[in-house]
Amino acid sequence: MIKKENRNWRRKKRHLSIRKKIYGTVERPRLCVYKSEKHIYAQIIDDDKGHTLVAASTLDKELRETLKKTWNKEAAREVGKLIGKRAIEKGIKKVVFDRGGYRYHGRVAELAEGAREAGLEF
């Protein structure tokens, strides 16, 4: 009997193969993206120490008041702008983008564009 492969399991496998090549340092931390059906999350991680330096999501109070929907491209762009603003405040300008096994398309691409608009370089 042929079983249907789970999409999330395949994404996790892709993410592990990507993570072998992508590594965040103090000078260039990793901007990691995770998305669920209703929300999108982004965090900047220093892999040397294993610490999250900056985080933002559609669950943040700053965005919840202004967003009508949390699952569309506009919300993803706002999360990108917010994480970019917070990173610049902490002195982080260059990052390595980790798309989390997702295609660089739709909400993931919009988050990246929002972060670039805020001043992050990748």
Curated annotation (Swiss-Prot):
Q: Which GO terms describe its biological process?
A: translation
Query: Is the keyword rRNA-binding assigned to this protein?
Result: yes
CDD domains linked to this entry: Ribosomal_L18_L5e (cd00432)
Gene Ontology MF terms: 5S rRNA binding; structural constituent of ribosome
What keywords were assigned to this record? Ribonucleoprotein, Ribosomal protein, RNA-binding, rRNA-binding
One GO cellular component, as annotated: cytosolic large ribosomal subunit
Family classification: Belongs to the universal ribosomal protein uL18 family.
* UniProt function note: This is one of the proteins that bind and probably mediate the attachment of the 5S RNA into the large ribosomal subunit, where it forms part of the central protuberance.
Task: Quote the NCBIfam families the UniProt record gives.
Answer: L18_bact
State whether it acts alone or in a complex, and with which partners, per the record.
Answer: Part of the 50S ribosomal subunit; part of the 5S rRNA/L5/L18/L25 subcomplex. Contacts the 5S and 23S rRNAs.
- What's the protein name? Large ribosomal subunit protein uL18
Q: Per the UniProt entry, what species is this protein from, by scientific name?
A: Thermosipho melanesiensis (strain DSM 12029 / CIP 104789 / BI429)
